[in-house]
Amino acid sequence: MGSTRRTALIFGVLFLATFVFSIGGLALYSPALHPAKFMAGIGGATRARLGLSCEVLLIIANVGTAVVIFPILRRQNEALALGYVTARLVEATFIAIGIVSLLAVVTLRHDAGASLLSDAKALVAVRNWTFVIGPGFWAGVGNGLILGYLMYRSGLMPRGLAIFGLIGGALICISGLGVVLDVFNKGGAAQVIATIPEFIWELSLGIYPIFWGFKASPILEAGPASA
């Protein structure tokens, strides 16, 4: 297996891992998002901790996708390739803040139970907003707009799929800002619909490189350069 094929395989596996850890993690820690019930003892604390551990692994996978592909993408445009790494780090930072917030909720439940419900609600609110700004905005900037553009220009992925990334990234950014500005409801129909192209794009970033590798592209033969 050549180095480029190996990079494509690792890149794809990491992208699929982001789906597994994000969906699996949310399923496990979701009771903690309902502080009134959680602080009253409904939903296991161990289950929540396992879910938040998945979120930690999600951060590793998120950043890993950018680090693994950077040496190749920099040959297309080094500034944008670095921008992709930065966008993933910013997204990961917001995810980390959300993790800490929910771990604090678990601690409050263990130490004081329902007596600190208002504090738990505030921490859950922090986590919810980190989700809006992190995966709900910066994922659109990084995976959608920047990576979509780089893949479109380089031809490493089918350009039809890369267009999904560009459209999806723009829609994610618009819907995320719309939620912040109270134009759209958080988790409402507009935001859900806006995620569909980005979902297709990110899923293809996991599946296509694993089974077919990257498409033939001049940047796979060229040295580092900006374009």
PLM features per residue range, with description:
Residues 1-227:
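Hydrophobic, aromatic-enriched alpha-helical segments typical of multi-pass transmembrane helices
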